[in-house]
Swiss-Prot record:
Monomer. Part of the FGAM synthase complex composed of 1 PurL, 1 PurQ and 2 PurS subunits. InterPro entries: PRibForGlyAmidine_synth_PurL, PurL_linker, PurM-like_C_dom, PurM-like_C_sf, PurM-like_N, PurM-like_N_sf. GO terms for molecular function: ATP binding; magnesium ion binding; phosphoribosylformylglycinamidine synthase activity. The gene is purL. ATP binds at residues 57, 96, 495, 532. Mg(2+) 1 binds at residues 98, 533. It is found in: Cytoplasm. It holds the Pfam family AIRS. It catalyses: N(2)-formyl-N(1)-(5-phospho-beta-D-ribosyl)glycinamide + L-glutamine + ATP + H2O = 2-formamido-N(1)-(5-O-phospho-beta-D-ribosyl)acetamidine + L-glutamate + ADP + phosphate + H(+). Substrate binds at residues 99-102, 121, 245, 317-319, 535. This is Phosphoribosylformylglycinamidine synthase subunit PurL.
Amino acid sequence: MSKFIEPSVEEIKLEKVYQDMGLSDQEYEKVCDILGRQPNFTETGIFSVMWSEHCSYKHSKPFLKQFPTSGDHVLMGPGEGAGVVDIGDNQAVVFKVESHNHPSAIEPYQGAATGVGGIIRDIVSIGARPINLLNSLRFGELDNKQNQRLLKGVVKGIGGYGNCIGIPTTAGEIEFDERYDGNPLVNAMCVGVINHDMIQKGTAKGVGNSVIYVGLKTGRDGIHGATFASEELTEESESKRPSVQIGDPFVGKKLMEATLEAITFDELVGIQDMGAAGLTSSSSEMAAKGGSGLHLRLEQVPTREPGISPYEMMLSETQERMLLVVEKGTEQKFLDLFDKHELDSAVIGEVTDTNRFVLTYDDEVYADIPVEPLADEAPVYILEGEEKDYNTSKNDYTHIDVKDTFFKLLKHPTIASKHYLYDQYDQQVGANTIIKPGLQASVVRVEGTNKAIASTIDGEARYVYNNPYEGGKMVVAEAYRNLIAVGATPLAMTDCLNYGSPEKKEIYQQLIDSTKGMAEACDILKTPVVSGNVSLYNETKGTSIFPTPVVGMVGLIENVNYLNDFEPQVGDKLYLIGDTKDDFGGSQLEKLIYGKVNHEFESLDLSSEVEKGESIKTAIREGLLSHVQTVGKGGLLITLAKLSAHYGLGLKSSIDITNAQLFSETQGRYVVSVKSGKTLNIDNAIEIGLLTDSDNFKVTTPYTEISENVSDIKQIWEGAIAQCLTTQD
């Protein structure tokens, strides 16, 4: 008789306990068919987390298959802890983005901190040393105190974990809209570097080889975290605070160093982070990838307190844990290593040839499940979508007050400088950061070389909402442009798809169309998808977030020398590359004036993106340009103001466009500064101005002139977010 009091198999069926765990009636019946019997409590819990949306991608898997996943540089694509891309000289870059949205909505500090910790371990599990962190964040408007609390907690959590573990946070983006009220998006990305011969895989193979647990002792925190992340947020979600994991960056640092030492041991067979679904997902996935079975003896698992049941052990998401498979007879070598790093560790099982996932506690069987159906045969749902009616009418922007509009946009938190927040992150630890947060992309030197990795993270929402297909293309192209802007060659990308409930026809259609657009852009821009994450059911009280695909992209800079003087100077001429059109659908201007975004916008020419990108990259590397800035949120006037304010330079510009077009967000445009004495020869590049040593920012069109002090613009732009957070307290 079991020493743990749990519902019987009959009670699980009759009282539909499985529904509380996240399984539908049909899914429960499929589990019964797989087992040839009714599952017990532990088995039901295991299937519920492995078949959750968060772990199985059961609503999104068909769309993910559209993405190109191979390329000249790709060494390892989706299916492992992170993607791996060649950067030459027997080196590779390892990277991935993950969401921690639901936990951050309930417990913002720990939700964000453990999101950072988890993505770091994904990179480390491949064998790479992390070199930088990035994040993409979304919150409701800051006139709401709950949103302020969430923002403060998330930023502190990101900084608290990253700073303690010693990895710089070098890039990110933050936007604000009421559609994220109560449902923030917290997407964390990590980048690492590794030698080819050190690349690890999460596989369990070799009959008789041992399974080793290392890291924090297992507690009851985070139980059913994967299931929680697959549900809509409701008023009852606050009661699921125990589903939010607790991070310990100091143990995380020890675990990282110990793991990076363990991968140098030839006797290591496979390794995987215990992330979502904890010991369940890590062990069963390793067995599936190895074509093996596993027998875990759960009484050997290090636990934080007595009485933790097999069900709780398997579903706990206690942080800072890794699972290793090592050659039989070499266990002590690894245990001694972990003891040296003051980490708890234990041999908890072995690899078998049964292709079954067997769990025992004091010789009593608590689970006996075939590996492949558990890990690879979750049901896949293809639902019915419904096209949104696009508004093809045109709003009137002919009578806007340019100065008033300019300052309102400049101080909106989405456009305002994020330095008040980024200053809470350690941006320089490791001393290899070349370009810090706040510009187009971060650049981190590969230690001991003259190479650097450029990385960026970008999300799109309003445009995806207005036209999912075109918006999907745009988010990939935006990341591509940001890497071009620092002279990098884009290599590959990772994605995080943040959407509402796929069971709603319009949202399901958004998934269909936006991923189609993303896949097309990936193909044309030659940026294959090597890793990723899906976060669905981002809804609060029945209201969905904007569909928000996020793209993390990395690029290679073969020689960083050209960045030594890559900074705009007095006397540099300014050029605009790309046409400016009446493009206001989905823009900050449309939202400001009309209070909503629901109009169409120009389609994106991806072939033109490649042509412009290659020309600009060449000009940067030939030493012609001192700065490149993409024209983004708020349009050209805002872009020029941010350039002037960031560098404290005067600016004088004359542009032949309308007043409204100053705020147009036509895609595919760059503002570049050409070094004094140099000549720019790029098609469709128009000279628009000059950088000066004055305190004057002056932009004229045939219809208006705006002339302001740079110092005033800088004060408003840099102080807006701090003012929002202090005046509302």
